[in-house]
Amino acid sequence: MRTALGVRADDRKAERVYDTREMALSEEWLLHAPKARPLGKGEKWNVFLSYRSVNRIWVLTLYDVLHQQGFEVFLDQVVLAGGDELIRVLEDGLQQSQAGVLVWSARTGDSDWVRREYQTLERQALERKTFCFVPVLLDNSKLPIFAANRVFLDFSSYPDGPNGGELLRLLHSITGKPLSPEAAHFAAEQDGLAKQLADEIGSAIRNKDPELLLDLFKMGGLAWETSSALGCKAAEGLIKLGRNDDALGMLEQLSKRFPRAVRTRQLQALALARRGKNDDLRQAQRILGTLYEAGERDPETLGIYARTWMDRYSKSADRSDLEQSRDLYAEAFERATDDYYTGINAASKSVLLDTPEELARASEYASRVQQIVGTEAHPGDYWMTATVGEVFLLLKKYDEAARLYKAAVGMARAEKASHESTWQQACRLMDKLKPSEEDRAKVRAAFSHLPDCS
């Protein structure tokens, strides 16, 4: 069972300076948001999160929101320690939880997994009358037949993280409390506002308009206050558009607003690593190393941490730095075997290590990743499509690699920083794979808007 981030809420109060307007907005939200139920005998967690790694960013934002609201949240990749018996820890975590949230989308892909998770949580709800089972749907995909007897909360308007009125409904559902008429009216108002802002942020990224992202953030409002989802989406957009200084400024404010949020720290480290000035790499590794030691070992944290070790290798040429990068990607992939991002990087770094044993390992990783991502483009998903291309590159199928890389660039033309990262990786791999000049030119054509490898 792919579950929960587990970090216990503590009594430390983060310092924050509110202006009058911000305080009024927060009080309005708190007026309608229910508090976590007191933990009873044998209970350790208010809520248990069940999910697949393909939805990890959304779940991480949900974790941040719940933790910020004072809920004790079980999330496997935080709770689990090396050597733990996975099934036993998950079973204990579920038994010790007051509620369970099943996060599902079409990208989950594995109907058998959905059925098992659904039946497990449904059984808990039948056996324990106080247990609240809350299924959550992240897109407009059709629900499986076996799930038709239960109402799913619809977060299809919030692909980047929970927000708006649906978040308020989720909080009520996991505490077993119905919405009052006033809360229902408030939730409906927030749905429209949060959806509009998310669409404006997405449009600004697509239109290469970082100034609009900054203006939207500066305007603020309740939708920016209740969840870090909008702020993180805007900051990630700035990173994609190469505005790392602005992203870091935005993330500093978000960290003060959401002091327990993990996603903001991940993005801070990513922006520092991409900026690459002076002490940036050291500071990025300090953030990520601290998260790692604190038990935050989800694929996103491990993936960015591994990336910084690759950056370090690029400067040092020290093979141990490259091995550290590959090992972190491999650790993440073994923790979440459906996470294609860490899987493809474990494969690629193994190629760069360039021994017969490592090349065999790379082939095994690449085959596993191809089972996840398939062989065709994924409309609207740059990174998954680029990963399909990278698998073909590793398999030395250069025509197919070029086709998929071109498709990836075409669906995210504004994301130049993402293109640069993908092209640099392809260059490193081709240095080891030794394609013919003709085959290299095919791959190069997809990135003709970027300088060639130095």
Question: What name fits each language-model region?
Answer:
Residues 89-92, 96, 101-141:
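Amphipathic helical hotspot of TIR/SEFIR-family domains
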Residues 275-280, 312-318, 351-362, 398, ...:
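Alpha-helical linker/edge segments of TPR/alpha-solenoid repeat scaffolds
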Residues 189-203, 224-236, 258-275, 296-315, ...:
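Amphipathic alpha-helical repeat scaffolds of TPR domains
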Residues 201-215, 236-249, 273-287, 317-326, ...:
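Helix-turn-helix repeat elements of alpha-solenoid scaffolds
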Residues 333, 347, 351, 366-368, ...:
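TPR/TPR-like (Sel1-like) alpha-helical repeat modules
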Residues 220-224, 258, 288, 295, ...:
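Alpha-helical junction/boundary sensor with strong preference for TPR arrays
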Residues 1-68, 132, 137-215:
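C-terminal interaction surface of TIR/SEFIR-family domains
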Residues 61-92, 107-115, 154-158:
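Conserved BB-loop
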